[in-house]
Regions:
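Extracellular glycan-interacting surfaces
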Residues: 1-325
Length: 325
């Protein structure tokens, strides 16, 4: 969800070792806060109705919440029932949390957590190829802005689940999406019916709200889809790497690239190439201009009409970022 507005003048960044806040000042980005450094953070969301209300998920300790832009953090009471939390989705009046083993929970306006049972049932049967002993997890959550009750859940590994009734019931996506290792999902806000999915073996596109899919991985050796986003002008972005993360410590690194499409995902052009770290998360830029690009090397780059430039470096590996207050 695009947080680029007058109140969203800070970048909130989740990493392998804590949360960071950077503020835009005089053309550069300055670190203003750091917290939760004992925790590996897996996801981050900013409340769409309050840019100072920030949620982060941790690998083993559930959620932390701040209502003042990160000055103070506390655990929700009660915390999410399964503390290995991998995915968050902040919606007006509610927060959804996806976990490992794969399950999905929702809390409305600070109330108790309710499990949305269809995700646990729909995610059965998946296993993670590099480590088959690991069961499936909810990797990513997304909402269709054009169809508010339609939700998407990426299961790693187990494919994609879709709900058309605000999470009460879920069904598996099967038509054309033949990669069960789904990392991120983007329902376009500007292109009716278009949905993108970044997967372990490539990138997929749907033009009918996720009912049918076609593989659209840009030509070249990069096949590992890691991230997808859309700016306020409707440009679509995807991050792809040469291979899976367990290869990124080799001499050639991730050799990642950022691709952009201005026609709803029909044609793609390379915007950045040769990025050392994998492009783990993207978020829309300020004033609808381009995107922020975060990497597994702890860098944040800004890409817009002026080109690409590194604005933050030296952080732990980044897992998520969002604009907020």
């Amino acid at each position: 969800m695009d947080q680029s507005n007058a109140q969203a003048a800070a970048l909130h960044i989740a990493t392998y070792s804590g949360w960071y806040r950077f503020a835009a000042r005089n053309g550069s980005w300055e670190k203003t806060h750091k917290a939760l450094t004992f925790w590996k953070l897996t996801s981050l969301q900013v409340d769409p109705e309050d840019a100072g209300h920030v949620y982060v998920a941790t690998e083993h300790s559930g959620l932390f919440v701040s209502r003042d832009g990160g000055s103070q953090w506390q655990r929700p009471k009660p915390n999410v029932p399964r503390l290995t939390t991998n995915a968050l989705l902040a919606l007006p009046g509610s927060i959804l949390a996806g976990t490992w083993p794969a399950a999905l929970y929702r809390a409305r306006n600070g109330s108790a957590w309710q499990e949305l049972d269809g995700v646990r049932l729909g995610a059965t049967g998946g296993s993670f190829p590099p480590s088959p002993e690991l069961s499936a997890r909810v990797r990513f959550l997304a909402a269709d802005n054009q169809t508010p009750r339609r939700l998407f859940a990426a299961i790693e590994v187990g494919g994609m689940l879709v709900s058309d009734d605000d999470g009460a019931h879920w069904s598996q996506v099967k038509e054309g999406l033949d990669d069960p290792d789904v990392h991120q999902i983007l329902p376009s806000a500007r292109h009716p019916g278009v949905v993108l999915a970044a997967c372990g073996e490539g990138v997929y596109r749907s033009t009918d709200r996720g009912e049918h899919w076609q593989k659209i991985t840009p030509a070249g050796a990069r096949t590992f889809g890691s991230s997808v986003s859309e700016d306020g002008n409707g440009a679509l972005y995807l991050g792809v790497a040469l291979d899976r993360p367990n290869t990124w410590l080799r001499q050639e690194r991730a050799n990642a690239a950022l691709f952009v499409s201005t026609d709803g995902g029909v044609k793609w052009q390379a915007a950045m190439e040769g990025v050392d770290g994998g492009i783990m998360a993207l978020c829309p830029g300020i004033d609808s201009d381009g995107v922020f690009v975060s990497t597994s090397e702890g860098d944040v780059l800004q890409f817009n009409q002026a080109g690409a430039r590194k604005i933050i470096s030296g952080l732990p590996a980044i897992t998520a970022l969002a604009l907020g207050a």
